[in-house]
Amino acid sequence: MKKLLLATIIFLLAFPCSAEPEIIAHNSAATKKIAITFDDGPHPTHTEEILDILKQYNVKATFFILGVNAAQYPSIVKRTFDEGHELGNHTYNHVFVNRVSDEALREEIRKTDDIITEITGRAPIVFRPPGGAYNDGKVAVIASTGHKCILWSWWQDTRDWSCPPVDKVVSTVMDNLHDGDIVLFHDFNSGKTPTAAALRIIIPRLIEKGYEFVSVSELIAAG
């Protein structure tokens, strides 16, 4: 019995179990910190309006960028970076990562990294899968490309892409508020988006409550 136990210990030391790839959606240790995030941009008008609001309140955010849109609007990507916001990878063509091959996913990530790096001089280190769709295998692929896989706090999905009333977006954020939340917005919307109007209400209220706005990477490192 002792020999079996010793052999088991030796085996585990020689072949340690690898940790599951991490998916980040919240950091409860980030006291009085919040990360607001925007998916699918840049958009030629919506992103600029959002950037103006963030600049007005000296708020930093994280933008998960589609490569195809970055290629079309590089000046907006550059402005976003220059104003101190974090840029994340959101694939090139908004593909659902659980529906493509590992090779195709790596190519989507690589192409988007390349164009963001070309524009800003810095490659993204965070990645958000479109639609929040993933599986363990694809999270491992994402990790192998050097990116952290970021979702959002499930209670902080504003669903602004569906163009709800402004007060609905505001209540989603304010009524479900926790330290260390990652809030999901979209800066690319073909409809009558409520996002900018909601931000003009949400940001001052969060400031009044003493919240600090940080990038996703800063939120992860907090606490």
Name each region found by the language model.
Residues 4-13:
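Sec-dependent N-terminal signal peptides
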Residues 15-19:
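Sec/Tat signal peptide C-region and signal peptidase I cleavage site
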Residues 20-100, 104, 108-115, 221:
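Active-site beta->alpha N-cap acidic-glycine motif
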Residues 21-28, 57, 69-71, 193-223:
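C-terminal domain-boundary segment and adjacent tail
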Residues 95-100, 158-160, 185:
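A short acidic, helix-capping loop that chelates divalent metal ions and anchors anionic groups
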Residues 125, 133, 139-176, 210-222:
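His/Asp/Glu-enriched short active-site or ligand-binding loop at hydrolase and phosphoryl-transfer sites
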